Amino acid sequence: MTKHRFSRRDVLNSATALAATVFASPLRAAAPEASAITPALVEAAKKEGKLAFYTAMDLAFAERLAKTFEERFPGVAVRVERSGAERIFTRIAQEYGGNINVVDVVNTADQAHCIVWKRNGWLAPYLPEEVAKHFDPQYYDPDALHVTTRILISPIAYNTNLVKKEDAPKSFADLLDPKWAGKMVKGHPAYSGTIMNSTFQTARDLGWGYFEKLAKQRVLQVQSATDTPKKIALGERAVMVDGAGYLVIRNKEEGQPVEIVYPEEGTPLAGGPSAVFKAAPNPNAARLFQNWMHSREAQQLLVDWARQYSPHRQTVEKPGIRKLADIKLMKEDPESVEKMGDEIKMRYAQIFKV
């Protein structure tokens, strides 16, 4: 069977007719009022009995989240479909292009995806009550079409058995030192939303010339932002150029020899939004899951177990974890990522020859 590769531009082009004839509306609807989890919603969800959750979360946490939901709402099963954010984006485009409606709720690690899905008219408006009460408006769409579920950072990290603290890199510039040649690992922007945003922000702030120099360092290329922390924890490489900061924190807490570095130039940032699809085959179960996923209970699980940052104001960070406000961050720009995504992938592939 021939496999077709979809670019972001392909997604836009293939979806135009469908969006115009099926989903588009001549009038912009008012944002819905905030919705609580009601007995009626729970009962309707139980009648559907299931939902499909496409997510870029690491599999262990996605399954933990799904299991906790199933315990809270017996009779509603969650099927977790985990992949890299960019792969999820392509998969949904292929399914919708073939008039296949499978996904109920999506969580991505690339805000740019929601720009496309919203433009295509694929998302259902839904505003969970706790989002309206406890999330800053910057973390949810004004039309209530998507909500930032988690806030991700992509720092540098290293294996403490292989690198002494005093020798560890402190900046992206330090990674160009010849002593790190053949000792680093990096994720790929064509697979991971976190890495797509990290690559865009680093290229914007430091220039593509930085990556041209980095490529000469014989960097091991892997796919996911969740792969790079594993490589340094196992000692397969000494330094992580980018990747899931929360996994480095989790691995360190579990006793693995890893340490996080917040680079002097700034740490790349990526919001991880979730949305309910308008054509969801299980719309009530989808809304129940989306609502609960943004409750304080689920968001605290995100903080405590996944070690990720939450936009929910009532969550409490564990002692010893650096607060997001205390980290120098690069600026997220999903609009530019949406416009430049294909160019980023192409230029990256040319530089790293992958």
Regions found by a protein language model. Name each.
Residues 155-162, 200, 270-282, 301-302:
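A bilobed periplasmic-binding-protein/Venus flytrap-type ligand-binding module shared by bacterial periplasmic
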Residues 112-116, 238-257:
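A ligand-binding cleft/hinge motif common to bilobed small-molecule-binding domains
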Residues 35-46, 50-52, 56-75, 156:
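Short, polar/charged alpha-helical segment
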Residues 1-10, 14-23:
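N-terminal secretory signal peptides
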Residues 298, 317-354:
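Extracellular/periplasmic bilobal clamshell ligand-binding domains
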